[in-house]
């Protein structure tokens, strides 16, 4: 997928989650 410029190591995807991004390998991907 496309990296969403947000990490999800300590907290889940927040802003980018609204854009359909999901956590994968500690990084939010679209």
Swiss-Prot record:
SUPFAM superfamilies: Cyclotides. This is a cyclic peptide. One of its GO terms (biological process) is defense response. There is a cross-link at residues 1-30 (Cyclopeptide (Gly-Asn)). Keywords: Disulfide bond, Knottin, Plant defense. Disulfide bonds join 4-21, 8-23, 13-28. PROSITE patterns: CYCLOTIDE, CYCLOTIDE_BRACELET. It comes from the Eukaryota. Belongs to the cyclotide family. Bracelet subfamily. The presence of a 'disulfide through disulfide knot' structurally defines this protein as a knottin. Probably participates in a plant defense mechanism. This is Kalata-B17.
